[in-house]
Regions:
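N-terminal intrinsically disordered, cationic/polar leader segments
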Residues: 2-65, 69-145, 149-186
Length: 186
């Protein structure tokens, strides 16, 4: 049995958790999240507590047990305080701006790149940093990853879009790598 799956989730007073058929609905001050209960798992809702149970000895069901419990815990945290992911722009002339709800990136392409947020996701930009915010942790992380994918940090100068605090391993240039003079002078 999963150690994470066995842990009981404490539900704050301002959050309501209800069963709706084969779904769990989590409502809070920031919004509402709905998760389908995987086959083979049961969810017990009692006063301020949530418990996910797995009666099966099947390895696949036990693997989903811990995952689903973590997903519910993230939903409870998301509807109370929300989730954010911060990205940093590094490069000469790299800029980001919010136009309405869309994020507009000027990152060295011949055209500005526009990113439209999915439902429940908001962008804010300040001083070369892009903040992706929302109540669904998985959606926030996925949108941040897709923005980073547009222009990953390159290994020579580190120009591109990276997560806040991410370390980019830099490579030596050609002249340093072979021990020769810069520019290939003979």
């Amino acid at each position: 049995m999963s150690r994470i799956g066995k842990a009981i989730i404490d539900v704050p007073k301002e959050v309501t958790v209800t069963k709706d058929g084969s779904d769990i609905v989590v409502r809070g001050v920031k919004g509402e999240l709905r998760h389908g209960i995987p086959y083979g798992l049961t969810v017990a809702i009692s006063d301020g507590k949530l418990e996910v149970e797995c009666k099966s000895s099947d390895k696949a069901k036990q693997a989903i047990h811990g995952y689903f419990r973590a997903e519910l815990a993230n939903a409870v945290a998301g509807v109370t305080k929300g989730w954010t992911k911060t990205l940093e722009l590094s490069g000469v002339g790299y800029r980001a701006a919010v136009n309405g709800v869309n994020l507009v990136l000027t990152i060295g392409f011949s055209h500005p790149v526009t990113v439209a947020p999915p439902a429940g996701i908001a962008f804010t930009v300040n001083e070369g940093k892009i903040v992706v915010a929302g109540i669904d942790k998985q959606a926030v992380g996925q949108v941040a990853a897709s923005i980073r994918e547009i222009k990953k940090p390159e290994p020579y100068k580190g120009k591109g879009i990276k997560y806040e605090g991410e370390y980019i391993r830099k490579k030596a240039g050609k002249a340093k790598a072979v021990g020769g003079a810069p520019g290939g002078v003979k």
